[in-house]
UniProtKB/Swiss-Prot annotation:
This is Urease accessory protein UreE. GO terms for cellular component: cytoplasm. Coiled coil: none annotated. Its main location: cytoplasm. Keywords: Chaperone, Cytoplasm, Nickel, Nickel insertion. Belongs to the UreE family. It comes from Dechloromonas aromatica (strain RCB).
Amino acid sequence: MLILNQRTQQLATDSVALAYDERKRSRLKVTLASGAEAGIFLERGDHLHGGDKLAAEDGSAVVEILAAPEKLIEAIADSPLLFARAAYHLGNRHVPVQILPTENGGKLRFQTDHVLAEMVRGLGCSVSDAEAPFQPESGAYGGGHHHGDESATDLHNPGHGPHRSVPKIHEFKPR
């Protein structure tokens, strides 16, 4: 069995399609497109995204991670205000959401949940079932997606791009 535990930018020699919930796991046994068995071993909290590549520990293969199509809810807002309201209410519930642009407002995809579907429908969005790869936003702090030796906790290199900083834990002292 191949051991996949190193991120790489090399050309892929194989692939595996994984649903969002599988891509969030740090330990996973998979069957590659070629039929070979492989084990994915990542640092706890590290998530995979469609397009990521993992190298085998022995250097014999590079596997591209594909976002597998899955059943989702698609909410379409016909104005920027409605889009913002729907995104706010889903985010307030910590729902993983994929954001897609449309000509007038925006489209939100999230995992199937009839209560959330009714909520965004009640706000005024048109709601439908969809089957598509799910690539939700990683969140305000990056969601554990790291490359190579980068570290989100390195205070001298706090993140990608300007104005990124490491979240601070405030210590409150008793009075």
